[in-house]
């Protein structure tokens, strides 16, 4: 492959990655805010007893 062909393939990969990144971001509402206290309380109520919300907790991970 020539340099021009390799550069074109590189640009196509970057473009495809960008399109995939933007399409998966549609699920969010665009805000980067922390969850409210009500949302945090509701999510912790739905967990079984003994579950750990901390990602570093390996012993009692649920979910």
Curated annotation (Swiss-Prot):
Belongs to the conotoxin A superfamily. The keyword Disulfide bond applies. This is Alpha-conotoxin-like Bu1.1. Residues 37-46 have a biased composition (Polar residues). Residues 1-21 form the signal peptide. Residues 23-49 are annotated as: Disordered. Expressed by the venom duct. The modification Cysteine amide is found at residue 62. The cysteine framework is I (CC-C-C). Alpha4/4 pattern. Residues 24-36 have a biased composition (Acidic residues). The lineage of its organism: Eukaryota, Metazoa, Spiralia, Lophotrochozoa, Mollusca. GO terms for cellular component: extracellular region; host cell postsynaptic membrane. Residues 22-47 form a propeptide. Negative results: does not inhibit high voltage-activated (HVA) calcium channel currents in rat DRG neurons (at 1 uM toxin). The keyword Repeat does not apply. Disulfide bonds join 51-57, 52-62.
């Amino acid at each position: 492959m020539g340099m021009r062909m390799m550069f074109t393939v590189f640009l196509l990969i970057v473009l495809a990655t960008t399109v995939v990144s933007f399409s998966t971001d549609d699920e969010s509402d665009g805000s980067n805010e922390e969850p409210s206290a009500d949302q945090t309380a509701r999510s912790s109520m739905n967990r079984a007893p003994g579950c750990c919300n901390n990602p570093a907790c390996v012993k009692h991970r649920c979910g």
